[in-house]
Amino acid sequence: MDNIDEDLTPEQIAVLQKAFNSFDHQKTGSIPTEMVADILRLMGQPFDRQILDELIDEVDEDKSGRLEFEEFVQLAAKFIVEEDDEAMQKELREAFRLYDKQGNGYIPTSCLKEILKELDDQLTEQELDIMIEEIDSDGSGTVDFDEFMEMMTGE
């Protein structure tokens, strides 16, 4: 079983542990798979029922109809991490909008250079130029949102 716990913060794992424990009424160390939807709902995590069922099937390796805590974390992480990606994209869009003062859908590379310098004041002028060259892949002298996202997320 590939362990994706490292995608979660200790706080998120603690919240999952509490939720898991409160549904593990017999304290057997496992919960019925049909309770997963209730737990996600209580945690305010949006999910698609069909995707959830497919993931339960994938994660419940022994097909017992019950999930041990580690299986539950593996499953819940898929929903929690996805939500974080959406939140991060929204934050990056807001940050981009702040620098795109004219609302043209792009920012000048000179502006991006200032941002990078603020993020890491150890960068030399040459390193900054190399980074800008990589980010502004089409050589337009501007960076659009997709190029900005790619730079910030590495995706």
From Swiss-Prot:
GO MF terms, alphabetically ordered: calcium ion binding
Lineage: Eukaryota, Metazoa, Ecdysozoa, Arthropoda, Hexapoda
Binding site for Ca(2+) 1: 60, 62, 64, 66, 71
Span of domain EF-hand: 11-46, 47-82, 87-122, 123-155
The UniProt record lists the keyword DNA damage: no
Family named by the database record: Belongs to the troponin C family.
This protein's GO CC annotations: centrosome; cytoplasm
Alphabetic keyword roster: Calcium, Metal-binding, Muscle protein, Repeat
Species the sequence originates in: Drosophila melanogaster (Fruit fly)
SMART domains linked: EFh
Tissue: Accumulates almost exclusively in larval muscles.
Record's protein name: Troponin C, isoform 2
